[in-house]
């Protein structure tokens, strides 16, 4: 009955929204308190102000870390990129007189509102994507976009601010469109960082290993956090802005102009302006409706029981054109997801409400970046229009009323004890724990990772992949194989082949397990032992090969091994 009532209210409100949907809003700005009074959420939820001007500028992208802090890319300078004569160096690591920054917001007393702000990296040039992440040797850090590079900002001395600014990838395109740059950074399975490449810009991305990509306009790609490799994930879309994974490991995006949401299949091509497909057709569509908008920004996937069974497999989509947060229910037709329109999750009587990013924290709290403005269109209205607001921005916090109270501590990604999370019943938490161990391997996690891998169903391919990659990283640590007595573990045998250490070679020498379908197992095992094995291991393998060759008509395999060993 609640859904029927809510649906009726939604239908009644559509005409009102369309009537007020002008390119330049006719009303004036409201205070944060008055805007809050104009926002409506479903029964059972509460919305509150988390942060507003002057604590922040215009928020673009949001993220949370393991300590419950909210990271935000904040801009005042948009839409004008700082000229190169204001750059502190050729890389543009700092811009003079810039008010743009990556900020960290903290709710220290647990009342649901930020009471502490830190300009972690200031003097930036229209920052967009932000992902909290740091190397083990650093106190804090993030990966972020600031014209013209993807950066690693790190606090190395513990003062709470970035004193290291290092280019990961770049320079990349920004000159044609400052609202179509790199954004929506997400840490995914296997330790890759996924990102969107926006409308109209062209970028040639070169990684440290020599791999490169040329991207024009909308695309999604992924890269290693250290910039060692870059790969295209999917091609097309017009101006994707927003990425989200579901519990199965599927990746979804929000796009402007083509469709509000896509499931992104690796290697697939999606509709864009004037771009053909690759001859195989476009990736499957999952949505037929448009939510009455050409401008969609931000997406959050609800699953894993985070809001209860009635909210399982739903997506929330930011709609800054209609000043709403849309809702779709996802069902699967075979392996293809389909989106069915539901009543809007958030509506507003204030047409300045501009939700441009959504972030669902691990504790179930939804954060919304509100680019509060009279004008939202980048092309539809001149950039120098006096109605463009340059000072107001809000972040809203939405939580279920049931069990509301003090903020939970987020003890998953980046925790000192991710092993505990490996035994969680939530696949999302297990995947995040595996990702944490990829970045910070721990010797004591080898056995729990093997247990988690053995207990994970074969059909959960993304979680199994994350666990295998985490196990590979942990097995590179000295002594990691010392407590493994089993010699018939086929899964471990396949992983050990990717571990370039003498310990791995010694274990493989006595390994009896053969990975299923591994027709090239024997030559790969020999090559690994010859390259990484100690002299004792090489001698043992040579004796093994000679003994085997004595029973054959020729010693071809032994000769081949000797050639490998001498290489």
Language-model-detected regions and their locations in the chain:
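A subset of signal/propeptide-processing and intrinsically disordered low-complexity segments
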Residues: 16-17, 455
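Long, ordered, helix-rich scaffold segments
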Residues: 369, 386-391, 398-567
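Secreted/periplasmic carbohydrate-active enzymes, especially glycoside hydrolases
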Residues: 2-5, 140-142, 422-423, 464
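Low-complexity, intrinsically disordered short segments enriched for Gly/Pro and polybasic residues
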Residues: 1, 16, 563-566
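Generic recognition of cysteine residues
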Residues: 6-9, 142, 256, 474, ...
């Amino acid at each position: 009955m609640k859904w029927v009532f809510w649906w009726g209210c939604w239908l009644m409100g559509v005409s009102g929204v369309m009537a007020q949907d002008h390119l330049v809003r006719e009303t004036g700005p409201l205070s944060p308190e008055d805007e809050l009074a104009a926002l409506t959420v479903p029964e059972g939820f509460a919305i509150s102000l988390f942060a507003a001007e002057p604590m922040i500028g215009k928020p673009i992208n949001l993220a949370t870390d393991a300590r419950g802090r909210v990271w935000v890319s904040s801009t005042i300078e948009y839409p004008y990129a700082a000229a190169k004569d204001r750059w502190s160096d050729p890389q543009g690591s700092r811009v003079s007189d810039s008010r743009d920054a990556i900020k960290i917001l903290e709710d220290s007393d647990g009342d649901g509102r930020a009471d502490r702000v830190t300009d972690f990296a200031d003097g930036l040039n229209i920052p967009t994507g932000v992902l909290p992440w740091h190397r083990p040797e650093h106190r804090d850090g993030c990966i972020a976009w600031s014209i013209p590079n993807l950066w690693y900002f790190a606090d190395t001395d513990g003062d709470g601010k970035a004193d290291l600014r290092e280019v990961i990838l770049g320079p990349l395109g920004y000159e044609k469109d400052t609202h179509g740059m790199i954004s929506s950074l997400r840490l995914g399975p296997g330790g890759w960082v996924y990102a969107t490449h926006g409308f109209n810009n062209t970028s040639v991305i070169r990684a440290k290993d020599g791999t490169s990509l040329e991207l024009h306009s909308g695309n999604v790609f992924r890269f290693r956090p250290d910039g060692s490799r870059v790969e295209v994930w999917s091609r097309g879309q017009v101006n994707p802005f927003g990425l989200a994974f579901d519990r199965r490991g599927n990746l979804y995006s929000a796009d402007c102009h083509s469709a509000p949401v896509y499931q992104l299949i690796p290697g697939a091509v999606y509709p864009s302006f004037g771009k053909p497909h690759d001859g195989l057709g476009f990736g499957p569509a999952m949505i037929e409706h448009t939510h009455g908008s050409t401008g969609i920004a931000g997406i959050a996937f609800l699953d894993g029981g985070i809001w209860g069974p009635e909210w399982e497999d739903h997506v929330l989509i930011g709609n800054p054109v209609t000043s709403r947060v849309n809702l779709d229910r996802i069902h699967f037709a075979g392996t293809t997801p389909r989106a069915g329109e539901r009543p809007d999750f958030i509506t507003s009587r204030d047409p300045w409400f501009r939700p441009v990013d959504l972030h669902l924290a691990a504790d179930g709290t939804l954060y919304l970046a509100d680019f509060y403005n009279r004008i939202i269109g980048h092309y539809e209205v001149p950039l120098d229009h006096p109605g463009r607001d340059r000072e107001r921005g809000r972040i809203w916090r939405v939580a279920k009323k049931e069990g509301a109270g003090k903020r939970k501590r987020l003890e998953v990604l980046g925790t000192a004890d991710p092993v505990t999370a490996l035994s969680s019943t939530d696949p999302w938490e297990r995947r995040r724990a595996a990702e944490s161990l990829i970045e910070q391997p721990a010797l004591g996690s080898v056995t729990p990772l093997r247990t988690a891998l053995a207990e994970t169903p074969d059909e959960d391919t993304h979680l199994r992949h994350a666990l295998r990659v985490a196990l590979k990283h942990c097995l590179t640590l000295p002594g990691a194989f010392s407590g493994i007595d089993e010699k018939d573990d086929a899964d471990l045998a396949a992983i050990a082949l990717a571990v370039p250490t003498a310990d791995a070679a010694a274990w493989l020498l006595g390994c009896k397990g053969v990975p299923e379908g591994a027709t090239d197992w024997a030559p790969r095992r020999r090559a690994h032992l010859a390259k990484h094995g100690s002299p004792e291991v090489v001698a043992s393998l040579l004796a093994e090969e000679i003994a085997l060759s004595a029973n054959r008509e020729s010693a071809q395999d032994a000769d081949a091994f000797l050639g490998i060993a001498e290489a």
